[in-house]
Amino acid sequence: MRYNAGSYDIVVIGAGHAGCEAGLAAARMGCKTLVCTLTLDSVAMMPCNPNIGGTAKGHLVREIDALGGEMGVNIDHTFIQSKMLNTSKGPAVHSLRAQADKKKYQERMKKVLETQENLHLRQLEVVSVEVEDGKVKGVLTKNGAFFECKAVIMTSGTYLQSRIIIGDVSYSQGPNGLSNANELSKSLIDLGIDLRRFKTGTPARINKRSVDFSKMIEQPGDEEIIPFSFISGNIDRDQVSCWLTYTNEETHKVIQENIHRSPMYNGSIKGVGPRYCPSIEDKVMRFQDKDRHQIFIEPEGDDTEEMYVGGMSSSLPEDVQVQMIKTVPGLENAEIMRTAYAIEYDCIDPTQLKASLEFKNIDGFFSAGQINGSSGYEEAGAQGIVAGINAALKVQGKDPMILTRSDGYVGVLIDDLITKGTNEPYRMMTSRAEYRLLLRQDNADFRLTEIGHNVGLVTEERWSKFQERKQNLERELERLKELQITNKTENNEKIVELGSTELKKPIRMYELIKRPELDYFSLACLDPERPDLPKDIGDQINIIARYEGYIQTQLEQVAQFKKFEKKVLPEDLDYNDVNSLRIEAIQKLNKIRPLNIGQASRISGVSPADISVLLIFLEHYRKTGKNTDN
């Protein structure tokens, strides 16, 4: 029986990585918030890989943190290994990755939600979102409870009508043996929301006691632990190792002989899988020129024997999985604890969303995370914090926070989803960001903390630490640009000792740092009055000095980009009325409804000629007395 169960400012459906960030952001901004989850035991669960960060994903975690989110703080408290990736490459692609203790990560995040002021965490299944006159009114649960609210954030992950597939066996279930949600999809369809089916998967978990690590290559963590959060401070912790091994011809033979039993190849799986995280059977069949593939054996926590078999995601039958795993060096006697599986689930077409992550046709209804067609904990958390902030701003009667492609990877992620859409689970990569030298993980706070503070999410403690860090960097850069190093013998002897060439004339310290064989730290011997600053300040100075020319070029590109972003397109424009647009462009523009010329130019099917037509139209529109510039 239906009953009125109370009212909230914001209701969040789901408590995965998107839901946690969304709920915390809304509550911390002063909104009375209800976070619903199918089970309290799955809050912030990691159903797949036991780590946070990685290439491009580490950038997202830093950006979540810079805005005032929780993911970075939480992993800093619960990681069991820390590693900086891509250090042999340029600073734009350096990415932090941390191996998580999955249970501790969950437990701490759940505690944060439980103790957060303005936030109520409840075990409930939402079966419908109720809308009246195009505006959210509330949500209804399976038990008949109706919660009135001003905004809803859907963060339902991979649970909507999800189906587990292992070989020729399939059944209705959520990830990791949990129940799924089968009724909410119908409510979304009734609201006119387009759904599609995607697929993802996870590898087996094996018992650590059954692994022969002597046949593998140890992968230890870094000696220097770099935190994810800008407010974590120094961390000193014992770390555990991961291990590297490889598949071989025997592994590939087992897969090839049983490929007809793979649901990916016999048509049992209808959903589209992730291109950049293929199953082991997909890798073997697609890349037959490769005689081996990397397999990483990763611990899932301090208090468990479960080991994650990274790189061996599969939906092959269980008996084939057993054969396959035992062909890998070090896994000859491996005991499977959890079978690998594929999971199909409903998700939305993200082009139905605005840049604020609010549905275009439903006032107050937001969506974030894997339900939007993305993959990964970090992508989900990034969308979650944006949706949470914007739902809170909506309730407060304020304009939304829109992050652009020049603001951060979060902006790139959202712009790609809402502008281009996606036909497969979307994964963030550094190559997707045009301005990646400006969007480094080390400067996420310089880019986003002020924005987080302006919307009311960044705490005064975090703001104070940021201000101090910003002042330290600016003052030190100014000092280095003024500090002159003379070409006296004593200085030249030290410079030669450092592997560089003598000075012919005096030079500013800032210019000296640009020499590839020198850096800020090695030149301390020529700088006796240098202030005692944190190491990360020196790291940033090295990047800013050495890449100054490239950074300036990208800043000029951003200025050009912003010119097009400022040319706003009318919200109610019917593109059928714009003369000379091609039919395909009219269809795409009417569907996506871009905010501005910049976004319009990134829509697949809209040509440069179409953009020229729109610019002419806007000029005429402006001359008739309607302003289209921000």
From Swiss-Prot:
Q: Where in the cell is it found?
A: Cytoplasm
Q: Name one GO molecular function term.
A: flavin adenine dinucleotide binding
Residues at which NAD(+) binds: 273-287
Q: Which domain of life is it from?
A: Bacteria
**Known cofactor(s):** FAD
| Gene Ontology CC terms, in alphabetical order | cytosol
Sorted keywords for this record are: Cytoplasm, FAD, Flavoprotein, NAD, tRNA processing
The positions annotated for binding FAD are: G14, A15, G16, H17, A18, G19
Any GO BP: tRNA methylation
Purpose of the protein: NAD-binding protein involved in the addition of a carboxymethylaminomethyl (cmnm) group at the wobble position (U34) of certain tRNAs, forming tRNA-cmnm(5)s(2)U34.
The UniProt entry, under PANTHER family, shows:
GLUCOSE INHIBITED DIVISION PROTEIN A, PROTEIN MTO1 HOMOLOG, MITOCHONDRIAL
Q: How does it assemble?
A: Homodimer. Heterotetramer of two MnmE and two MnmG subunits.
What the record says about family reads:
Belongs to the MnmG family.
Q: What protein name does the entry list?
A: tRNA uridine 5-carboxymethylaminomethyl modification enzyme MnmG
Organism equals: Clostridium perfringens (strain ATCC 13124 / DSM 756 / JCM 1290 / NCIMB 6125 / NCTC 8237 / Type A)
